[in-house]
Structures are given as C-alpha cells and as structure tokens.
C-alpha cells in the first residue's frame, strides 16, 4: 500500500516543500481584493469538504470518485486517492476553519475564498499532478517501480496529488498528502513557480542513473519495463536485439546498459495531465511525464524519427515543469 506523506516532507532525506503559513490570513486581510501573492492554508479533509459544500465547489477527489478510477503513473488502474481522516478526531470543521482565520464568528468566510473555490469548480484549464517518490525504510518488500507501494531494498513509496485549476488569470490549487489538504490561490504569473514547487523533491536512495540524454524506441522502453515486471529475460533480449540499432546514447556509453539503468535507477515519477476546451469547443488533453533519478529529473519526449516512434529522455530542472505545462495549456486552448 502506498504511504501518503506530510505535505512538507517528501523524502527520507528531509527535503521539504516551501512551508505554508500557519494561521490563516484573517478575515480583515486583503478584503475586497484578490492577492497577487500565493496564499496557502492547510486544513483537514473534513474542513476542506465542508468549505466545498458551503460554496458548491466539491473537492477534486470527490469529483474523481464519481467519474471512476484514475490511471497511475506506472499504467495500472486504481481509484483516485481520497485523503484519510482520523476517525477519533471529533473537531468541528468550522471550528478548525475559524481557528485559521478563514471564517469569523458570524460565519462569514474570508473574502478571497469564494472566488478561489469558484475557479476550482469552474475552470477554463485543468492540470492534474501525480507525484510518487521512493524513500528508504527499515523493511524490505521487493516491488518493481515507484507507484506500486513497498519497494526494493527496504524502501517505500510516498505520494502527493495536486489539482490546479485556472480561469481568467487566477489559479486555485489543492494538494493532498496523508490527512492534510493544502488549498492555495494565486495570480497565474506565479503559476510556474508553484508548479516547480511540486517537482522540487529528491530521494535519499542513490541507484546508478542513466545518462542525462538518451533516445530510444518507444517499444523498447515500454517492453523492457514489462519484461522486468514479469521476469521475462528472453523478451528483454529480443527487444534489445531488435531495437538497439535505433538508440542514441552519449559517446562511450553502452546502449544495453543504459536501457537497464533507465528502469533500475528510477526513484520517482511525475505526471501532469492538462485539459481544456479548444476554440472549436472540443475537449483537448495533453500530458507531461517525468522520471526521477538520483541526479535529478528526466523528461520523456515522444516523437517520430524515420518512421520509428521514439522517446527522448532528457535531464531537466524542476523549473522546467512550468514551461512544459504552459506549452500544453496553449495547445489545449487553441
């Protein structure tokens, strides 16, 4: 079972996302206007859902449960994760929200909240992010790849889900990890930095990574992954025999070894799915796929070369996520 984690801590080395403010901004702050600076508040699942009911803006996991299962990063199917709640916690959600300054004694909400949750419910563009990072643990339970739960060599997977919704220059983001829910809202000029914040993780695990730039046939990349999960070495050999001539690796690198390292060295995965309505009224979808290694992220860029479906595997920094998402946002809106 996948371990879900504190929003502020994403790996065994103690790497942290930027901390959200403790107490909320208070009903008097920013009244009558929307702040250009990102605002974030962390609440329980109960409190987040109470806000959603009050404003008729359901939380993303509630929508996902109604629309069916979600595809995980490793291609398997499972229901979209629902943030857990402590059954022994009897705190009234409105008392919790009041303590954060998000509702006053008369029941009036912090002025920016209705607009933020309206963007969440009625966006022009949606970005769903799924992040899985492998970290060390004391136990050992061999599993193939991040996204499956327990991992090889005494490791386990930690997961963060985030939903970003944009409309008319404003973005509302909801993220879940464990029992915590973070709700944020900001001007879309801050969006690239907020996306980079999601990808700003590392892992304390340090398997040998592949080269920073590779190109290989799509069938080879997927097929070797299947062969490894099903313990089919003959299939691996046949795929290598057929596709190695089409690989491009740095000078001096061994292509066969690079294929193996591309799978054995993975310590995390990130997927961003972008959707929106185009000028022709049709719903359009695009996606970004990244793999995390001990020396950083690689983006996967599919393309066709001389009639062969290929995947470029290239090193990127977390800041590149904003650029890749922006390109897709422009595409789905056209």
Outline where the language-model segments fall.
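Intrinsic-disorder-associated interaction segments
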Residues: 40-44, 106, 213, 225-229, ...
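Short, amphipathic alpha-helical interface elements at domain boundaries
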Residues: 2-22, 26-98, 102-108, 115-121
């Amino acid at each position: 079972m996948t371990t879900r984690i504190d929003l502020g801590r994403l790996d065994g080395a103690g790497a942290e996302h930027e901390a959200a403010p403790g107490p909320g901004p208070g009903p008097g702050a920013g009244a009558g206007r929307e702040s250009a600076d990102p605002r974030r508040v962390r609440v329980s699942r109960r409190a987040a859902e109470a806000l959603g009911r009050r404003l008729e803006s359901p939380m993303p996991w509630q929508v996902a449960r109604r629309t069916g299962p979600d595809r995980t990063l490793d291609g398997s199917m499972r229901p979209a994760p629902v943030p857990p709640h402590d059954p022994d916690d009897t705190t009234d959600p409105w008392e919790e929200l009041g303590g954060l300054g998000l509702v006053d004694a008369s029941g009036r909400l912090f002025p920016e909240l209705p607009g933020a949750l309206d963007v969440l419910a009625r966006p022009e563009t949606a970005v769903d992010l799924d992040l899985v990072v492998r970290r060390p643990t004391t136990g050992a339970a061999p599993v193939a790849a991040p996204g499956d739960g327990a991992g090889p060599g005494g490791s386990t997977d930690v997961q963060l889900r985030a939903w970003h919704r944009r409309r008319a220059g404003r973005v509302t983001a909801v993220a879940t990890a464990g029992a915590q829910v973070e709700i944020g809202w900001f001007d879309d000029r801050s969006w690239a930095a907020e996306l980079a914040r999601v990808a700003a993780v590392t892992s304390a695990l340090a398997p040998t990574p592949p080269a920073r730039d590779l190109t290989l046939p799509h069938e080879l990349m997927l097929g070797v992954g299947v062969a490894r999960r099903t313990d089919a070495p003959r299939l691996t050999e046949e795929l290598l025999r057929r596709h190695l001539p089409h690989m491009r690796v740095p000078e001096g690198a061994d292509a066969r070894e690079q294929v193996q390292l591309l799978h054995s060295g993975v310590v995390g995965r990130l997927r961003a799915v972008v959707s929106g309505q185009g000028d022709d009224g049709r719903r359009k979808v695009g996606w970004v796929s990244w793999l995390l290694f001990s020396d950083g992220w690689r983006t996967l860029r599919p393309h066709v070369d001389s009639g062969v479906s290929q995947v470029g595997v290239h090193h990127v920094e977390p800041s590149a996520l904003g650029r890749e998402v922006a390109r897709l946002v422009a595409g789905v809106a056209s």
